A protein has these predicted regions:
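A short, basic N-terminal segment
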Residues: 1-50, 68
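C-terminal leucine-rich, beta-strand-based interaction scaffolds used for sensing/assembly
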Residues: 2-14, 300, 304-386
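P-loop NTPase nucleotide-binding core
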Residues: 49-53, 57-165, 346
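Alpha-helical DNA-recognition elements
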Residues: 65, 277, 354
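Conserved Walker B catalytic segment
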Residues: 135-205, 214
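Short regulatory helix/loop adjacent to the ATP-binding pocket of P-loop NTPases
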Residues: 206-224
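Conserved AAA+ ATPase "SRH/arginine-finger" region at the nucleotide-binding site
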Residues: 225-235
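Amphipathic alpha-helical "lid/sensor" segments that cap RecA-like P-loop NTPase cores
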Residues: 238, 242-304, 365
Length: 386
C-alpha cells in the first residue's frame, strides 16, 4: 500500500496478512536462532502458536538466513491446506520437491525423469514469463501414488550430497484426513529414518497441532523439537514501531507505541495492522487519539466478519464467549451460569471443547481466553449493540 505524502510516493512501513521480508520482521531473535540451530543439526521441528503470530514469517526468515550462510541446503516449502487426503498430500509433496529443487524447465524435466518417472511427470509452461508447473500422467484415484514417495527427500539428499529441509505449512490438515492416525504412522515411519533431511512442521490451528505432537499416544509424539512461539514483548514492539515511524519522517513516542501494541494484546498481526492504520492517519506525530480512532476503524472493518462468526454459533456458545470477554472466571458458579444463561455446570465443558475446536478460544491451565484480541474487544464494545 502506498500514500502520497508531500508529493512523494511513500511506502507504508508496516505489513500484515502476508509473509514479511527482513525489513518488516520484528524481533524473534531467540526463535530464529533456535530454528537455525535445528536446521544446522537437522532436528525436526514443530512450531506451535495461535493463528497470525508469525510462524510462516519466522520460517521464511530462518530459511533465508540459512541459505545465505551455506549453499549445502535444499529448502522445500509447501502448504497442504488444500489437501483432502493422503493421495493429494503425496502429489503435493512430490510436486513441491521437484519444483523447488529445479532452477529451469530443463532442470525440472531432468530431475523428474530421474526421481519420479513412475508418476509420468508432465511439465507445462503456464505464461509468457516462463513460469512452469508439473503434473502427473497417472490418475491417483485409479493408480494411487505409493507411500515410498515420502523417501524422495532422502533420495535427493543422497544423490546431490546435500541436506534437505522440508517446511510444511498448515500441517494440522493431516488430522482431518480419513484414517488420519494410520497416515501419521506412515509419515513417521518414513521420515524418522531420513538422516540427511529435517522437517519443519507448522500450522494455524493450535489445538490440532498440540494433539498431533503433544499426545504420547500419537505417532508424532517426540518426533523432534517443539517450539511454542511467545508473544513479542511490548519493549520489542516499541523499538520496531518507533523505528519504522522515524524511518519515514514521522514520530511516535515509546509510551504511545506501547499503548498501540497493548491495545491489541501484542498480537503480531493486529499490531502491524493497527500501526499501519495509525501511520496513515499521522501527519507528523502519532498520538493516543490517533491510535484509538484507528482501532475503531479496524473494529468497523471487521464487524461483518465477526457477525458472521457469531452466526455460526449456538446461543449458549455466544453467551460463553461474552462471559469470557467480560472477564468472568467462575464459569460453573450459579451466578455466572444464570447471568449468561449458560445452562448447567456440566455444559461448560461441552462449550469449551466446541469453541476450542473452532479455534475461537484457548486454554492455559485454568485460564480460558479468546484467541483473537480484536474479536474479544468487539464482543465487549459492539456485539451487544447489534
Amino acid at each position: 500500500m502506498y500514500i502520497f505524502a508531500k508529493k512523494i510516493l511513500m511506502k507504508v512501513p508496516f505489513a500484515y496478512g502476508r509473509i514479511v521480508g527482513a525489513d518488516d520482521f520484528t524481533d524473534r531473535k531467540n526463535e530464529t536462532a533456535k530454528l537455525l540451530a535445528n536446521i544446522a543439526s537437522l532436528t525436526n521441528t514443530a512450531i506451535i502458536s495461535p493463528r497470525r503470530w508469525g510462524k510462516s514469517s519466522l520460517v521464511s526468515k530462518a530459511v533465508e538466513t540459512a541459505s545465505k550462510e551455506s549453499n549445502n541446503y535444499l529448502f522445500v516449502r509447501m502448504n497442504v491446506f488444500k489437501c483432502e487426503d493422503e493421495q493429494e498430500f503425496y502429489a503435493m509433496f512430490a510436486k513441491s520437491i521437484m519444483s523447488q529443487i529445479s532452477s529451469s524447465v530443463e532442470n525440472l524435466m531432468s530431475n523428474a525423469r530421474e526421481f519420479i518417472s513412475s508418476l509420468l511427470p508432465k511439465i507445462s509452461v503456464s505464461d509468457p514469463a516462463g513460469h512452469y508447473e508439473i503434473s502427473f500422467g497417472v490418475d491417483v484415484r485409479t493408480s494411487p501414488i505409493d507411500e515410498s514417495i515420502l523417501d524422495l527427500p532422502q533420495t535427493i539428499a543422497s544423490k546431490k550430497k546435500m541436506k534437505v529441509v522440508v517446511c510444511i505449512d498448515e500441517f494440522q490438515q493431516i488430522g482431518e484426513f480419513r484414517n488420519a492416525l494410520r497416515f501419521q504412522k506412515i509419515l513417521r515411519n518414513h521420515w524418522q529414518e531420513q538422516r540427511d533431511v529435517a522437517y519443519i512442521l507448522y500450522g494455524s490451528k493450535k489445538h490440532m497441532m498440540l494433539s498431533i505432537f503433544g499426545d504420547y499416544n500419537r505417532p508424532f509424539y517426540r518426533f523432534g523439537d517443539i517450539m511454542f512461539l511467545p508473544k513479542i514483548s511490548t519493549e520489542d514492539w516499541c523499538d520496531y514501531i518507533v523505528g519504522r515511524f522515524s524511518a519515514t519522517g514521522k514520530s511516535i513516542s515509546r509510551d504511545v507505541a506501547a499503548y498501540l501494541a497493548e491495545s491489541v494484546d501484542n498480537h503480531s498481526y493486529y499490531v502491524q495492522q493497527l500501526a499501519q492504520a495509525s501511520w496513515l492517519r499521522t501527519s507528523d506525530t502519532c498520538t493516543k487519539d490517533v491510535v484509538n480512532s484507528s482501532l475503531e476503524s479496524i473494529l468497523d472493518y471487521l464487524n461483518l466478519q465477526f457477525i458472521n462468526t457469531m452466526d455460526t454459533l449456538t446461543d449458549k456458545q455466544r453467551n460463553y464467549l461474552c462471559a469470557i470477554a467480560d472477564g468472568a472466571e467462575q464459569f460453573t458458579s450459579m451466578e455466572t451460569l444464570a447471568k449468561y444463561n449458560l445452562g448447567s455446570a456440566g455444559n461448560i465443558r461441552i462449550l469449551k471443547a466446541a469453541l476450542r475446536k473452532k479455534d475461537l478460544i484457548d486454554i492455559e491451565g485454568k485460564r480460558v481466553f479468546i484467541q483473537d484480541p480484536v474479536f474479544c474487544l468487539w464482543l465487549k464494545t459492539q456485539f451487544r449493540k447489534i
